[in-house]
Amino acid sequence: MSFSSLRRALVFLGACSSALASIGPVTELDIVNKVIAPDGVARDTVLAGGTFPGPLITGKKGDNFRINVVDKLVNQTMLTSTTIHWHGMFQHTTNWADGPAFVTQCPITTGDDFLYNFRVPDQTGTYWYHSHLALQYCDGLRGPLVIYDPHDPQAYLYDVDDESTVITLADWYHTPAPLLPPAATLINGLGRWPGNPTADLAVIEVQHGKRYRFRLVSTSCDPNYNFTIDGHTMTIIEADGQNTQPHQVDGLQIFAAQRYSFVLNANQAVNNYWIRANPNRANTTGFANGINSAILRYKGAPIKEPTTNQTTIRNFLWETDLHPLTDPRAPGLPFKGGVDHALNLNLTFNGSEFFINDAPFVPPTVPVLLQILNGTLDANDLLPPGSVYNLPPDSTIELSIPGGVTGGPHPFHLHGTDNPGPWFLHCHIDFHLQAGLAIVFAEDAQDTKLVNPVPEDWNKLCPTFDKAMNITV
């Protein structure tokens, strides 16, 4: 066998397993620059742990996560500072560990580290983590996070739930952000683009007769995906960290930052089947030559690409068909306006900036949390002007966000939920956030200092960052 043939064979065999390496809940996470070519085109990136996607971080319900993030970024053509947001974590009493730059912290600078220390007393399910500084996560800094429930009430529905059953979807760009549109869709870090139809694809292996809990995570910066697996149905049992009553579908649409757990019964003929994630981007749609695809391979099937055809989707997921396994009931009274405070968020776009109630979000030089800790409590005095809203304690809030705005649909993400502190609300299309589509809720500002005592290392972040950036405050 020639060297080139051996290399091709090794690469092909290496693609046969797409299980992610697992770390945590107490760990160190190096943030590094690296040149990678997940779709065959080499480019500079920013990565967690030197891999794309970043390593799977795991823990159990009740764990104390202690993740020391070490900034080893040196590529001056890209951002060399960073922050990490632990997407979906409530961060009760640890608002300072939430991660969005200039909302709850200053960025970590090259050569420094910062310990994110938070507990998950009541949360379980499928989450993820990513940079929350400008557009940095689009350049690679994103990975899955799973909190397992040792007493999962739906464990009887599946046989396998481990690192081999996590599926990540990502848009991929051949140049540093913000150049749109994406060149490729990556599934578990591998994919093809029209210019290289022979790049490796992720292979997810199953054994006939077993039931698998797959955890699907959209780490997208922009597109949403229609996700299907040829010849198989999916029984959804979790959405965004919430257990749902089992609901069977043939396909689903998943937006940026969303997560679903579904059970797949490996009861079809031993063979290879296409996994499809079709983006809503006209230039990259379809499945010609294996783009937007991965492979579901039964043990014992030949090592080759599938020949299955996409079947007609007759039972597509409608989110209104999902119901919580345990329904705590929504707060407030069951009609519009049956709350303590109703807020209408009017979204507009002028061609380059987004506005919420006539204000674009522009990151302040002093984080909102630091402003509050220094005694500025009124939203009218907090920066950025027009983008901070006070929420009183022990109140129910109704948000109204109109549809039909340019660039939609806009998948909005609310950090925190019911805890004192400044919490980001923003569109999770990262390019829209960068263009101002965000606000901050200063919830129970007067109690923030008492409820969220910050560690000494947090106090050092801003002076260190300001010195590195030559900022005078």
UniProtKB/Swiss-Prot annotation:
<feature type="glycosylation site" description="N-linked (GlcNAc...) asparagine">
    <location>
        <position position="75"/>
    </location>
</feature>
<feature type="binding site" description="type 3 copper site">
    <location>
        <position position="426"/>
    </location>
    <ligand>
        <name>Cu cation 3</name>
    </ligand>
</feature>
<comment type="similarity">
    <text>Belongs to the multicopper oxidase family.</text>
</comment>
<feature type="domain" description="Plastocyanin-like 1">
    <location>
        <begin position="23"/>
        <end position="148"/>
    </location>
</feature>
<keyword id="KW-0560">Oxidoreductase</keyword>
<dbReference type="GO" id="GO:0052716">
    <property type="term" value="F:hydroquinone:oxygen oxidoreductase activity"/>
</dbReference>
<feature type="binding site" description="type 3 copper site">
    <location>
        <position position="132"/>
    </location>
    <ligand>
        <name>Cu cation 3</name>
    </ligand>
</feature>
<dbReference type="GO" id="GO:0005576">
    <property type="term" value="C:extracellular region"/>
</dbReference>
<dbReference type="GO" id="GO:0005507">
    <property type="term" value="F:copper ion binding"/>
</dbReference>
<feature type="glycosylation site" description="N-linked (GlcNAc...) asparagine">
    <location>
        <position position="374"/>
    </location>
</feature>
<dbReference type="GO" id="GO:0046274">
    <property type="term" value="P:lignin catabolic process"/>
</dbReference>
<dbReference type="InterPro" id="IPR011706">
    <property type="entry name" value="Cu-oxidase_C"/>
</dbReference>
<keyword id="KW-1015">Disulfide bond</keyword>
<feature type="glycosylation site" description="N-linked (GlcNAc...) asparagine">
    <location>
        <position position="350"/>
    </location>
</feature>
<dbReference type="InterPro" id="IPR002355">
    <property type="entry name" value="Cu_oxidase_Cu_BS"/>
</dbReference>
<dbReference type="InterPro" id="IPR045087">
    <property type="entry name" value="Cu-oxidase_fam"/>
</dbReference>
<dbReference type="Pfam" id="PF07732">
    <property type="entry name" value="Cu-oxidase_3"/>
</dbReference>
<feature type="disulfide bond">
    <location>
        <begin position="138"/>
        <end position="221"/>
    </location>
</feature>
<keyword id="KW-0479">Metal-binding</keyword>
<feature type="domain" description="Plastocyanin-like 2">
    <location>
        <begin position="160"/>
        <end position="298"/>
    </location>
</feature>
<protein>
    <recommendedName>
        <fullName>Laccase-3</fullName>
        <ecNumber>1.10.3.2</ecNumber>
    </recommendedName>
</protein>
<feature type="binding site" description="type 3 copper site">
    <location>
        <position position="428"/>
    </location>
    <ligand>
        <name>Cu cation 2</name>
    </ligand>
</feature>
<keyword id="KW-0732">Signal</keyword>
<feature type="binding site" description="type 2 copper site">
    <location>
        <position position="413"/>
    </location>
    <ligand>
        <name>Cu cation 1</name>
    </ligand>
</feature>
<feature type="signal peptide">
    <location>
        <begin position="1"/>
        <end position="21"/>
    </location>
</feature>
<feature type="glycosylation site" description="N-linked (GlcNAc...) asparagine">
    <location>
        <position position="309"/>
    </location>
</feature>
<keyword id="KW-0439">Lignin degradation</keyword>
<feature type="binding site" description="type 1 copper site">
    <location>
        <position position="410"/>
    </location>
    <ligand>
        <name>Cu cation 4</name>
    </ligand>
</feature>
<feature type="binding site" description="type 3 copper site">
    <location>
        <position position="130"/>
    </location>
    <ligand>
        <name>Cu cation 2</name>
    </ligand>
</feature>
<dbReference type="Pfam" id="PF07731">
    <property type="entry name" value="Cu-oxidase_2"/>
</dbReference>
<dbReference type="InterPro" id="IPR001117">
    <property type="entry name" value="Cu-oxidase_2nd"/>
</dbReference>
<feature type="binding site" description="type 2 copper site">
    <location>
        <position position="85"/>
    </location>
    <ligand>
        <name>Cu cation 1</name>
    </ligand>
</feature>
<feature type="binding site" description="type 3 copper site">
    <location>
        <position position="87"/>
    </location>
    <ligand>
        <name>Cu cation 2</name>
    </ligand>
</feature>
<dbReference type="Pfam" id="PF00394">
    <property type="entry name" value="Cu-oxidase"/>
</dbReference>
<feature type="domain" description="Plastocyanin-like 3">
    <location>
        <begin position="365"/>
        <end position="444"/>
    </location>
</feature>
<keyword id="KW-0325">Glycoprotein</keyword>
<feature type="binding site" description="type 3 copper site">
    <location>
        <position position="415"/>
    </location>
    <ligand>
        <name>Cu cation 3</name>
    </ligand>
</feature>
<dbReference type="InterPro" id="IPR008972">
    <property type="entry name" value="Cupredoxin"/>
</dbReference>
<dbReference type="InterPro" id="IPR011707">
    <property type="entry name" value="Cu-oxidase-like_N"/>
</dbReference>
<feature type="binding site" description="type 1 copper site">
    <location>
        <position position="427"/>
    </location>
    <ligand>
        <name>Cu cation 4</name>
    </ligand>
</feature>
<keyword id="KW-0677">Repeat</keyword>
<keyword id="KW-0964">Secreted</keyword>
